[in-house]
Amino acid sequence: MVASRAIGSLSRFSAFRILRSRGCICHSFTTSSALLSRTHINYGVKGDVAVIRINSPNSKVNTLNKEVQSEFVEVMNEIWANDQIRSAVLISSKPGCFVAGADINMLASCTTPQEAARISQEGQKMFEKLEKSPKPVVAAISGSCLGGGLELAIACQYRIATKDRKTVLGVPEVLLGILPGAGGTQRLPKMVGVPAAFDMMLTGRNIRADRAKKMGLVDQLVDPLGPGIKSPEERTIEYLEEVAVNFAKGLADRKVSAKQSKGLMEKLTSYAMTIPFVRQQVYKTVEEKVKKQTKGLYPAPLKIIDAVKTGLEQGNDAGYLAESEKFGELALTKESKALMGLYNGQVLCKKNKFGAPQKTVQQLAILGAGLMGAGIAQVSVDKGLKTLLKDTTVTGLGRGQQQVFKGLNDKVKKKALTSFERDSIFSNLIGQLDYKGFEKADMVIEAVFEDLAVKHKVLKEVESVTPEHCIFASNTSALPINQIAAVSQRPEKVIGMHYFSPVDKMQLLEIITTDKTSKDTTASAVAVGLKQGKVIIVVKDGPGFYTTRCLAPMMSEVIRILQEGVDPKKLDALTTGFGFPVGAATLADEVGIDVAQHVAEDLGKAFGERFGGGSVELLKLMVSKGFLGRKSGKGFYIYQSGSKNKNLNSEIDNILVNLRLPAKPEVSSDEDIQYRVITRFVNEAVLCLQEGILATPEEGDIGAVFGLGFPPCLGGPFRFVDLYGAQKVVDRLRKYESAYGTQFTPCQLLRDLANNSSKKFYQ
């Protein structure tokens, strides 16, 4: 039973998610003038306790790089050599961040696995010295303690953390395609148990402080303080330091012990893991789960398992060696380069490159309380924006308000909010059927039906009741913004803000500017999106913008493949097997067959035969029979409420029978089907950069992965071209062009890169 429980606790293992970085606030501190020569780490002495403060300048977060490591070793050597110091406290001067991790840019210059492995070994040696410190060191944690930051903390003799939402602990290296390389794979299993350690390392999930305490990852919690003469953050940090200093004194005086007693279940699990058979069963179960979920596309999880297994079965020395070697191997893989590229792209897309807007948006108004409008309202009020939600019917408005409340209440169930906080946030939302209050609106976002006439109508109405400075943003997914703005009296204030469904889950926001959109309007739209917690790309106006324009030719190819006789389940298996989180046929059902038809027709008119392939007639017939996808319960699949299982909709065969296309054997292998889907997407993405729709490859990759589910392991269409090779992409396109024509003709920019192997999107 104990063995099954140890294995069962791994059931929380989830599929890959993308790392969300946390912003941190700077906080000043005082230190002795003799120590000011150090940039990142200084210390002062309180009685016989050294208080080591980490504070990387000109950065919102503390990260571990070679300079920080050098200063840390220098400081620790001084402390160990000073007989007046008997213990130490390690604390950050940034209230929202302990240490956010190691600086991944250290790996950028590595050209061999051995170079990367040396970086791992240096970290291991530093933390081993800390672990064996003759003077106890207490880690005082407030804010994010991630990656190398957690490895630093668990090498200390004791850990105290603030019990608030900003304090999270985790090892997200797997999300970057690598593993914890400074001893994490060896210390974590001993500290929290093998099942919990696997769960942390294989998912990269963040652990909140209260949960970390129950796991044994943190030894003591400190409640945050409220406001006083100083801010709550400053008061909490000072209190945390005071508690940590007192405990460090107690450790040095041997009045308290760093060893925590384990509960019965922890003792039973630890005992079970001493039995070789149980350990082998755990390894086997975890490996099988990893292989099933990653489909062999991500090498890091299996290497994490190997490193842990080596340490447990062969001892510490072998474990640390395995960790550093596997870290070096992973750092040079295409997958890690792709995932690190996405991380860097995310950081770029969370900044407002258009500067601060002249006027901050304080009052937001949203037109349309449907799925999208209510979703936009939820992410707005959740971040403190006062929001008006207008609809034309009482029923529609009520449904929208209920959706917002449910979204907030779900957070209460997950203990992310209290019921008081939920009600306070919900009070920021005012629902109405008229334009009352719009005279104070700084921005109006319309989420009405995708019909140009309807959008023209509401634009005119909005401009008649809002102030001159008010921005009008359209949440259209395909209609050109310049066409919407054609009836505007203030075209410089009109912009596109394309959200993705479900709005509270999807991170991407695609902002679309016309030739007349002012820079200040763009800056305001980006500022609102960032406040809503979005990752933002800004693109030029045009049919389909960037994301819908890339999706349309890919979906056209999907329809053709279905017409050629590949059933939806096989197509889904092939596309998820290539790295898409959702299969192609399932994606069509999720988007909505009616929406797919609408987009296919509009973009078909705009781009002609190049967007051809599959017959739009298939979509039309499905819509006529009410097969709209998940929202209607039937699409390519049949969906049942409350059930994750789905069966093929056999009635689709009756529709397809008159639309069958003969498959071409030379381009119909499983691999060809995968590359037909991916290359049409990639070619269109590169063409968007060529035409100036996209400003940078980074935004193109972020938009594709975060908005459309392009395989994260490939890093986005532009990173894929760099890693796979432009010439190979062009060769693939030429092969399919010979079978299908101009739909696969490679764009000029791709051909240019193929002709010059030294040119890449990322130099």
From Swiss-Prot:
UniProt site (Important for hydroxyacyl-coenzyme A dehydrogenase activity): H498
Modified residues (Phosphothreonine): T395
InterPro entries: 3-OHacyl-CoA_DH_CS, 3-OHacyl-CoA_DH_NAD-bd, 3HC_DH_C, 6-PGluconate_DH-like_C_sf, ClpP/crotonase-like_dom_sf, Enoyl-CoA_hyd/isom_CS, Enoyl-CoA_hydra/iso, Fa_ox_alpha_mit
Keyword annotations from UniProtKB, A to Z: Acetylation, Fatty acid metabolism, Lipid metabolism, Lyase, Membrane, Methylation, Mitochondrion, Mitochondrion inner membrane, Multifunctional enzyme, NAD, Oxidoreductase, Phosphoprotein, Transferase, Transit peptide
Record carries keyword Membrane: yes
Residues found modified as Omega-N-methylarginine: R399
Gene Ontology terms: cellular component: mitochondrial fatty acid beta-oxidation multienzyme complex; mitochondrial inner membrane; mitochondrial nucleoid; mitochondrion
Site annotation Important for long-chain enoyl-CoA hydratase activity: residues: E151, E173
Pathway in which the depicted protein is active: Lipid metabolism; fatty acid beta-oxidation
SUPFAM superfamilies recorded: 6-phosphogluconate dehydrogenase C-terminal domain-like, ClpP/crotonase, NAD(P)-binding Rossmann-fold domains
Protein localization: Mitochondrion; Mitochondrion inner membrane
The organelle targeting sequence, given as a residue range: 1-36
Residues carrying N6-acetyllysine: 46, 60, 129, 166, 214, 249, 289, 295, 303, 326, 334, 350, 353, 406, 411, 436, 460, 505, 519, 540, 569, 644, 664, 728, 735, 759
Residues recorded as bearing N6-succinyllysine in the entry: 46, 60, 166, 213-214, 230, 249, 303, 326, 334, 350, 406, 411, 415, 436, 440, 460, 505, 519, 569, 620, 634, 644, 646, 664, 728, 759
Active site, renumbered: E510 (for hydroxyacyl-coenzyme a dehydrogenase activity)
Chain's role: Mitochondrial trifunctional enzyme catalyzes the last three of the four reactions of the mitochondrial beta-oxidation pathway. The mitochondrial beta-oxidation pathway is the major energy-producing process in tissues and is performed through four consecutive reactions breaking down fatty acids into acetyl-CoA. Among the enzymes involved in this pathway, the trifunctional enzyme exhibits specificity for long-chain fatty acids.
Quaternary structure and interacting proteins, as annotated: Heterotetramer of 2 alpha/HADHA and 2 beta/HADHB subunits; forms the mitochondrial trifunctional enzyme. Also purified as higher order heterooligomers including a 4 alpha/HADHA and 4 beta/HADHB heterooligomer which physiological significance remains unclear. The mitochondrial trifunctional enzyme interacts with MTLN.
Protein name: Trifunctional enzyme subunit alpha, mitochondrial
